[in-house]
């Protein structure tokens, strides 16, 4: 086993990487509230895992979506548990994200030289809210349908571009198959990809600049 480790160590300098990670200075004022961002990340990873599992059974069509969710909850092995964990972790992710934003704001984590860290964090917060909106519509039940109809209808009040914007969001004049397809694509591909990109920007900046000072 040591020979295998030595082989990788010689080429990748694993020990140097491990030392850099474990030897990072942690200020004495850091408390449990500084863990909120990490908890949000953990919830996101749970979302990815449970969401991926449900894609094996979910069918994104207006005729089959609700039935496929019912199948997940009643027929698929541990489907009820996977979907329940997905819903619980979604709520937890939103809550932790809100608390994390408040903690960063109250401790001045948005000030120089951490402006870009704050900007990427705000973008991640918007993406998190977008996950909630798009995911809410996927079961195609009454709550999801009317929620999407209301949310996508809000831009209609904007002069000139309101109606075209609503049609762009829905894919048609009314909420239907095109809307479900759009929201499913956003929820399972576009938003996760954008979230991963901004996380890859967010975390190295935190690593480089360190944790902000006390309140």
Curated annotation (Swiss-Prot):
The chain crosses the membrane at residues 32-52, 90-110, 116-136, 186-206. One of its GO terms (molecular function) is metal ion binding. Its cofactor is heme b; heme c. Keywords: Chloroplast, Electron transport, Heme, Iron, Membrane, Metal-binding, Photosynthesis, Plastid, Thylakoid, Transmembrane, Transmembrane helix, Transport. One of its GO terms (cellular component) is chloroplast thylakoid membrane. Heme b 1 binds at residues 100, 202. Heme b 2 binds at residues 86, 187. Heme c binds at residue 35. It comes from the Eukaryota. It is a multi-pass membrane protein. Gene3D superfamilies: Cytochrome Bc1 Complex, Chain C. Binds 2 heme b groups non-covalently with two histidine residues as axial ligands. InterPro entries: Cyt_b/b6_N, Cyt_B6_PetB, Cytb/b6-like_sf, Cytochrome_b_N_euk/bac, Di-haem_cyt_TM. It is found in: Plastid, Chloroplast thylakoid membrane. GO terms for biological process: photosynthesis; respiratory electron transport chain. Belongs to the cytochrome b family. PetB subfamily. Heme 1 (or BH or b566) is high-potential and absorbs at about 566 nm, and heme 2 (or BL or b562) is low-potential and absorbs at about 562 nm. Component of the cytochrome b6-f complex, which mediates electron transfer between photosystem II (PSII) and photosystem I (PSI), cyclic electron flow around PSI, and state transitions. The 4 large subunits of the cytochrome b6-f complex are cytochrome b6, subunit IV (17 kDa polypeptide, PetD), cytochrome f and the Rieske protein, while the 4 small subunits are PetG, PetL, PetM and PetN. The complex functions as a dimer. This is Cytochrome b6. The lineage of its organism: Eukaryota, Viridiplantae, Streptophyta, Embryophyta, Tracheophyta. The gene is petB.
């Amino acid at each position: 086993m040591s020979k295998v480790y030595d082989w990788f160590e010689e080429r990748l300098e694993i020990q140097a990487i491990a030392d850099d990670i474990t030897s990072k200075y942690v200020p004495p004022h850091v408390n449990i509230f500084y863990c909120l961002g990490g908890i949000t990340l953990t919830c996101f990873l749970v979302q990815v895992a449970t969401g991926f599992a449900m894609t094996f059974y979910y069918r994104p069509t207006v005729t089959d979506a609700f039935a496929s969710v019912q199948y997940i909850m009643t027929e698929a092995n541990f489907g009820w548990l996977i979907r329940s964990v997905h819903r619980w972790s979604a709520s937890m992710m939103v809550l932790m994200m809100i608390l994390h934003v408040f903690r960063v704001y109250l401790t001045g984590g948005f000030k120089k030289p951490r402006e870009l860290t704050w900007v990427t964090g705000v973008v991640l917060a918007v993406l998190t809210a977008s996950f909630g909106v798009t995911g809410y519509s996927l079961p195609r039940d009454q709550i999801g349908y009317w929620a999407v109809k209301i949310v996508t209808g809000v831009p209609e009040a904007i002069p000139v571009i309101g109606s075209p914007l609503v049609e762009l969001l829905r894919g048609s004049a009314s909420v239907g198959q095109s809307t479900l397809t759009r929201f499913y694509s956003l929820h399972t591909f576009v938003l996760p990809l954008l979230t991963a990109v901004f996380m890859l920007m967010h975390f190295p900046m935190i690593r480089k600049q360190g944790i902000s000072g006390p309140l």
